Amino acid sequence: MPKRTDIKSILILGAGPIVIGQACEFDYSGAQACKALREEGYRVILVNSNLATIMTDPEMADATYIEPIHWEVVRKIIEKERPDAVLPTMGGQTALNCALELERQGVLAEFGVTMIGATADAIDKAEDRRRFDIAMKKIGLDTARSGIAHNMEEALAVAADVGFPCIIRPSFTMGGTGGGIAYNREEFEEICERGLDLSPTKELLIDESLIGWKEYEMEVVRDKNDNCIIVCSIENFDAMGIHTGDSITVAPAQTLTDKEYQIMRNASMAVLREIGVETGGSNVQFSVNPKNGRLIVIEMNPRVSRSSALASKATGFPIAKIAAKLAVGYTLDELMNDITGGRTPASFEPSIDYVVTKIPRFNFEKFAGANDRLTTQMKSVGEVMAIGRTQQESLQKALRGLEVGATGFDPKVSLDDPEALTKIRRELKEAGAERIWYIADAFRAGMSVDGVFNLTNVDRWFLVQIEELVRLEESVAELGINGLTAEFMRHLKRKGFADARLAKLVGAAESEVRKLRYKYGLHPVYKRVDTCAAEFSTDTAYMYSTYEEECESNPTSDRPKVMVLGGGPNRIGQGIEFDYCCVHASLALREDGYETIMVNCNPETVSTDYDTSDRLYFESVTLEDVLEIVRIEKPQGVIVQYGGQTPLKLARELEAAGVPIIGTSPDAIDRAEDRERFQQAVNRLGLKQPANATVATIEQAVEKATGLGYPLVVRPSYVLGGRAMEIVYDEIDLRRYFQNAVSVSNDAPVLLDRFLDDAVEVDVDAICDGERVLIGGIMEHIEQAGVHSGDSACSLPAYTLSKEIQDVMRQQVEKLAFELCVRGLMNVQFAVKNNEVYLIEVNPRAARTVPFVSKATGMPLAKIAARVMVGQSLAEQGMLEEIIPPYYSVKEVVLPFNKFPGVDPILGPEMRSTGEVMGVGRTFAEAFSKAMLGSQSGMKKSGRALLSVREGDKHRVVDLAAKLLKQGFELDATHGTAVVLGEAGINPRLVNKVHEGRPHIQDRIKNGEYTYIVNTTAGRQAIEDSKLIRRSALQYKVHYDTTLNGGFATAMALNADPTDQVISVQEMHAKIKNMKA
């Protein structure tokens, strides 16, 4: 039956900011849904607070609202836009929860909006643990022994029945937030307390432990005529007990017999029927007890998910796009498969003749004090995917694409160390982020497959594959470089060994191994992902490399080609913003008639969608892989400045190998990144910088520090996201830094900068074409200097800076752009103190603020800069004027501290945010209030506020206190702060610090006395002493600021109503056009 004609407009709910457990896979699914529904002629209205997404670009929908995904705000949008239907299955848990709330509040009924893609009842039945259990029993499927609790008393009763160890999961949360495994009563009570707090329905599911069972997932698509297909089966390499988002996963499932697979296939279809998913994709998770084969259903998600993004990329079957069309009434047999050029219908189940491996990427090094063991609560921040013809090839390709310094199974421990075996055993038993490497180490240390299995519960089939690779490595090392015959090398390359890994094993340089391989004429061939195991020919060029005979890449040569290098797996400091830039480069150059080639290995992103570029190579962004693709494609130009540090690190070597890099030259990039060369340029231009020095030893550092004066910002050169960057307050601190952190940098010195306390930090994005400079936007940070720019909220236009100061910055940016010969994008960071402008740093590449500036001003910076790189001047593009919008846009960040109990949630020079939201308003206050609502800060309008500030902030705290009183807050203060306020005639209630006796701050936070806390500190000891205040504020959901500037901005925002007015991106950009006219 064709599409529904009773609906004309559809509201799509997005997923909001990127958090652990819900990343950019929902930008990929949302963008697909927008495209699919618009090509069917529907009017599409989109709401998503995440500005860094492709789906919130103005061309993607008819009306785009970058507004908080909060039911009251969405009600305003529904009232204004009057959609006929709402599609809630594209935005993860956030969208489902919002849709249920709109239903509950009667908003959908009030405006006559139908829910499509899933019914409220089906969502509830899948998400409500008790209803789900009953439904499974009804169709004869087993679930884990479990019970439901709404308070501690009920929880303990369930535990008595289920026994320890047991698994605790809160309802309606995602990424396993608040859950965990309890081995005893003490742990049980702690996890339950946290879980009850985090579940919106105050409900816990307590399950028997399935630790050590095997875990499988089925990606199922069903239409309203009950056609069901399995897009892909996925097997978890790691056994139950580790969240599937933190597990290494493999597709298709490798260790099921056909009979077991058929049973699971039928069961997953039965689950969709019973839950009532009539249109679209779902994922069903199963667990199998390896001892007796008992099969149970763990859960199902009635929406597209992280796994469906992986399944889409693994098979080439666009689940989100098909699901969107099914939601408006199509059936699977009516839809055609794009990849085979319509030669097969969508009801044709994909079959694949290769193996796909996904490995998660973790960032524990950014969270000192975090528990880095893997449990049922998700902690990874990104993932890499690789495709190979065998499990071994696929696994080794994924390991090198992860960018954690491994080129394959590099050893983690030295076998000479007497503690080696103890350490290996511990790492195998209690899995951390690096367990896969310790498994290889275990085989090196002589453990047997059974021995490793008993500690890890990883299926023996996978272990045998790894053991074989370790034995091969041993023979490579033994034979040396002369033993690498043509035959042996081909064998090794087919097993997925990288040149760099072989080089390490034989003790040679990577270039020598590559030279030898070229001498043998050994190169990879490229196979296509075609959904049908080569049964039909394919129209899309979606490729992966392997060492076989026949190459299917068939490059074309009639159009000029440009290759874009992506950013690899997401991590803190290099996320979706860089993918956004890569996608824009591809889109702009395609519009201009270039053939675009994308190279990336991140399965969550829009850049790895088969129709974003003309040709997609799903490959790791490493020197070896990129050189091979360049060899076969011969592009006119390669863009390295859009994918963050990943491609930039390769720029020099690519250039040396004769690869044509376009845009800013690698040498110019180096001039900005290398401290001494940069200093020369700055001195030549006569610009001001904070007093600084470059040192290579601890003695030098101590000597220079005395001259510069404390506090100092210390950091290694060449890092992204402030890795290993700290503020040190005295010599003891400095010495500790050198002992703990200095090994971060490769032969590079450490930089000391005088720390400008209380300065206002500013980011400027600009584009230079060699003749003129276009200022994209000047963003004023809300948190003062010393907080990493990626963790600070910022405003465009600036909200306190004078026009004169901004003009000084404009002139300096222009001088720097010409001095450094920038071609394309650049980002400059300044600090302003006492009306003086100091230059902090220059990055001649795409910065993470590019999507924000593009949305706020309507100028697609990444597209403009891509055109500059291929030789179109700014004048030819008609892009000469900086745009200062007639409204405020504020970007606020989202931090993952709730996933890492034990970590101090204070902002500092090392970046730790995972995502961001944007708020738009007529005033700064209105925009910031929306950004706060969008980031789910939970700020209340009144109540009791606690002020506890450091010495340097005391002169400004009186003003903040007065503002809060005016807003109707009652005030508490710690001793030093109270004295200052008292002198100004404000008398707060005095509270004890923890060491001053009870009742102290901690008690009062636990009792729920505060709605707001401002706590600023300086100096390592003071920060350590006040850590508990911040941890408790986070745990008890009290909004807190760790900078005074943040406090002032919050006080301003309290005067505004974030649900008062909604404005679409299209209306915002129209205002700019009118203003120009």
Curated annotation (Swiss-Prot):
Residue sites binding Mg(2+) 1 per the record: 285, 299
Keyword check for Transferase: no
UniProt-annotated binding residues for Mn(2+) 1: 285, 299
GO cellular component entries: cytoplasm
UniProt entry keywords in alphabetical sequence: Amino-acid biosynthesis, Arginine biosynthesis, ATP-binding, Ligase, Magnesium, Manganese, Metal-binding, Nucleotide-binding, Pyrimidine biosynthesis, Repeat
Protein residues bound to Mn(2+) 4: 841, 843
Domain of life: Bacteria
Cofactor: Mg(2+); Mn(2+)
Region annotated Carbamoyl phosphate synthetic domain, chain positions: 554-936
Residues engaged in binding Mn(2+) 3: 829, 841
Domain ATP-grasp: 133-328, 679-870
InterPro entries (UniProt xref): ATP-grasp, CarbamoylP_synth_lsu, CarbamoylP_synth_lsu_oligo, CarbamoylP_synth_lsu_oligo_sf, CbamoylP_synth_lsu-like_ATP-bd, CbamoylP_synth_lsu_CPSase_dom, MGS-like_dom, MGS-like_dom_sf
GO molecular function, one term: carbamoyl-phosphate synthase (glutamine-hydrolyzing) activity
Binding site for Mn(2+) 2: 299, 301
Residues the entry annotates as binding Mg(2+) 2: 299, 301
Binding note for cofactor: Binds 4 Mg(2+) or Mn(2+) ions per subunit.
All residue ranges annotated as the MGS-like domain in the record: 937-1077
E.C. number: 6.3.4.16, 6.3.5.5
Pfam families: CPSase_L_D2, CPSase_L_D3, MGS
SMART domains tied to this protein: CPSase_L_D3, MGS
Function recorded in the entry: Large subunit of the glutamine-dependent carbamoyl phosphate synthetase (CPSase). CPSase catalyzes the formation of carbamoyl phosphate from the ammonia moiety of glutamine, carbonate, and phosphate donated by ATP, constituting the first step of 2 biosynthetic pathways, one leading to arginine and/or urea and the other to pyrimidine nucleotides.
Family (UniProt): Belongs to the CarB family.
Domain notes: The large subunit is composed of 2 ATP-grasp domains that are involved in binding the 2 ATP molecules needed for carbamoyl phosphate synthesis. The N-terminal ATP-grasp domain (referred to as the carboxyphosphate synthetic component) catalyzes the ATP-dependent phosphorylation of hydrogencarbonate to carboxyphosphate and the subsequent nucleophilic attack by ammonia to form a carbamate intermediate.
PANTHER family found in the cross-reference section: CARBAMOYL-PHOSPHATE SYNTHASE [AMMONIA], MITOCHONDRIAL, CARBAMOYLTRANSFERASE FAMILY MEMBER
Assembly behavior: Composed of two chains; the small (or glutamine) chain promotes the hydrolysis of glutamine to ammonia, which is used by the large (or ammonia) chain to synthesize carbamoyl phosphate. Tetramer of heterodimers (alpha,beta)4.
The name this protein goes by in its record: Carbamoyl phosphate synthase large chain
Organism the protein comes from: Yersinia pestis
UniProt lineage: Bacteria, Pseudomonadati, Pseudomonadota, Gammaproteobacteria, Enterobacterales
Gene that specifies this protein: carB
